[in-house]
C-alpha cells in the first residue's frame, strides 16, 4: 500500500508538470530565450522578474499575453518588447502562464 501511494504521488506530480513543460517547449519554439532568460537579464527582463512584477495581479496571464502579442515599452525602463503577431492568443496565454510560474 505504501509503495502504491508513493507512485500515485509521483504520477500526480508528473501530471501537474505536464502543462508547464509544454509551455516551456513553446518558449523554446517561439524563440523567447533570444531576449529573455529564466533568472538572468539578457536584453529584456528575466522570467523571475516578470513573475514577481505580476504576482499580485489576478488577470496577469491575460495582461502578459496581450503584452507578448502587442509589444510594449515603459514597463522595464528603456526595454522594448517588440510585437509578436505570429504568436496566437492561445500561445501567448500559454507563454504568459509559463513565465508567471517561474519562482
PLM regions and their residue ranges:
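Bacterial N-terminal signal peptides that target proteins for export
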Residues: 1-8
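Sequence/structural segment immediately N-terminal to covalent heme-attachment motifs in c-type
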Residues: 21-38
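Short, structured helix-loop boundary elements
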Residues: 24-25, 44, 61
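Axial heme c-ligation environment in periplasmic c-type cytochrome domains
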Residues: 34, 43-54, 67-96
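Post-signal/leader-peptide non-cytosolic segments of secretory proteins
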Residues: 57-66
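Short hydrophobic/aromatic patches at helix-to-coil boundaries
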Residues: 99-103
